C-alpha cells in the first residue's frame, strides 16, 4: 500500500453539501480493494486559474488515502468518466 493524495475539481453547479457523499461513493473502489481513506477535505468553491469547459469556478476537494496503484488508477478512471468532475490530479507526496 502506498500513500496518495488526490485533488478533484468539481463543477460549481453542484451543491457543496452533496460533494462529500458523492465522492464517498467513488471511494468505495479503494475500500473494496483493501485500501483506506485517511481524510477527505472539501475546500469549497474557488475561482479557477483559467477556464475549464467554459467554467470559471469549481469546488475543490483533497483526499488522502492508502491504496494499491491499481486501485488508485481505477478510482482516477471512474472520476474522469463523471461529467461533474472538471479535473483530477493524483500525486504521491514525499515522505519526510
UniProtKB/Swiss-Prot annotation:
GO CC term, one of those recorded: ribonucleoprotein complex
Top-level taxonomic group: Bacteria
Biological processes per GO annotation: translation
Any coiled-coil regions, as ranges: none
Signal sequence, start to end: none
Keyword Repeat: no
GO molecular function: small ribosomal subunit rRNA binding; structural constituent of ribosome
One Pfam family from the record: Ribosomal_S6
Keywords per UniProt: Ribonucleoprotein, Ribosomal protein, RNA-binding, rRNA-binding
HAMAP family named in the record: Ribosomal_bS6
Entry similarity comment: Belongs to the bacterial ribosomal protein bS6 family.
Protein role: Binds together with bS18 to 16S ribosomal RNA.
NCBIfam families with a match to the protein in the record: S6
Protein name (Swiss-Prot/TrEMBL): Small ribosomal subunit protein bS6
Gene designation: rpsF
